[in-house]
Amino acid sequence: KRVLLIGCDPKSDTTSLLFGGKSCPTIIETSSRKKAAGEEVAIGDVCFIRDGVFAMELGGPEVGRGCGGRGIIHGFELLEKLGFHDWGFDYVLLDFLGDVVCGGFGLPIARDMCQKVIVVGSNDLQSLYVANNVCSAVEYFRKLGGNVGVAGMVINKDDGTGEAQAFAANAGIPVLAAIPAHEDIRRKSASYEIIGKPGTQW
């Protein structure tokens, strides 16, 4: 299967784990640099591959110098110019932060750019508050005729307290997986190691 991972967070840190801590040149910064040089952006300038997974980062403005949500919208406009919809991937994973109150970050839901949303959250109140906002946004756009649904929830750093499990039950969504709050996972993540590989514990 052909899989594409797109980081849609202005921090541009989605793909760093995949590439051993290295940051990918973002679509927005590459586009600005190429435009200044009078050149066109090519797919090879912004799309990279490791272990069979293609990946890219949309990027965003520097801290305190613009609107992150607007940057995401601009990033997708550039993707469309590159022929994003004709690339023939079997799965496209969009990693968005949960601030769907911002129209830019809610773009994939609002414009039916994705089929399903997987909510990632932990057992703390702030995380579940954001998860609830995402579910509410999906429901809102479905009432307006949208087709995006919530596939379920992945519980991250699960400490066994059951708060996220209870939230999922109340929200009427299944728990797809629970990633334990384990020191080995934390250590591997901090070292930019891919955690889940065939034949390993995870």
Give the ranges of each region predicted by the language model.
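Short, glycine/acidic-enriched loop or turn micro-motifs at the edges of active sites
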Residues: 10-12, 60, 98, 159
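Conserved catalytic-core segment of NTP-binding enzymes
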Residues: 74, 81-91, 96-181, 187
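Flexible beta-alpha connector loops of hexameric P-loop NTPases
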Residues: 60-70, 125
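Hydrophobic residues at beta-strand termini and immediately following loops
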Residues: 56-58, 179
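C-terminal boundary of histidine-terminating zinc-finger modules
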Residues: 189-202
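Short, charged beta->alpha transition segments
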Residues: 39-48, 78-82, 104-107
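N-terminal phosphate/diphosphate-binding loop that engages ATP/GTP or pyrophosphate donors
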Residues: 2-55
